[in-house]
Design a protein with these regions (language model features):
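Beta-strand/loop edge motif enriched in small/polar residues
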Residues: 1-197
Length: 197
């Protein structure tokens, strides 16, 4: 049995790279348990507006996210025209503050809106009770996509041109597999039955 680390001796980051031939992590009648530590929290929302071109973001919650982590910032526009954007963190999170290596291409809403006697506002009206709901939350979601254990295929011509990536295959009724908190990159093999991530 292969044991990479235990709770007493954790590792910071593990990268499992599949070879260029089979590109598979195969379990035949055995046991595979992968428990990665997920970032905390896994997702939150913006805590303030973010303009197009912004590299600094304010979140609504404190995180333990690290430099190099990949985050996804969801759209917040009413018409659904903006796409989710992937950013790479330039530094460890500082409280609720993030700084990224790349910039947002579209603005994101990041403030709560409150029902008031004059309509929706960014601050509640003291003493005004419109019934429910009183708060509209359209803040953009922000998720951390990085995990400390990564299973990935090679970034070569076979992947780029043919979709030939890594896969995890579990065979036999006696096999036991638990995968939790693991990131998969360049996985799946296009056009091959049973070669899914």
């Amino acid at each position: 049995m292969f044991v990479h680390h235990t709770d007493d001796q954790p590792t910071h980051r593990t990268l499992l790279v599949a070879d260029g031939i089979a590109r598979g992590l195969n379990v035949q009648g055995g046991r595979l348990e992968l428990y990665g530590t997920a970032p905390q929290p896994v997702w939150t929302r913006l805590g303030d507006h973010a303009a197009a071109g912004a590299a600094a973001l304010t979140l609504s919650a404190t995180t333990n996210w690290r430099a190099g982590d990949t985050i996804a910032v969801g759209p917040s526009d009413f018409y659904g025209m903006a796409a989710t954007e992937r950013l790479e963190l330039a530094a460890d999170a500082a409280g609720t503050q993030l700084s990224s290596r790349n910039r947002l291409t579209a603005a994101r809403w990041g403030r709560l809106q409150y029902a008031t006697s004059a309509g929706m506002r960014l601050a509640p009206e003291p003493g005004f009770n419109p019934g429910t709901p009183t708060v509209l939350d359209e803040r953009a979601p922000v998720a951390n996509l990085s995990r400390r254990i990564v299973i990935q295929g090679s970034d070569d011509a076979a992947w780029r041109n043919s979709g030939f990536g890594a896969h995890v295959m579990v065979m036999g009724a006696a096999s036991r597999v638990v995968i939790d908190g693991v990131e998969l990159r360049r996985v799946g093999q296009a056009g091959v039955l049973g070669r899914y991530p």
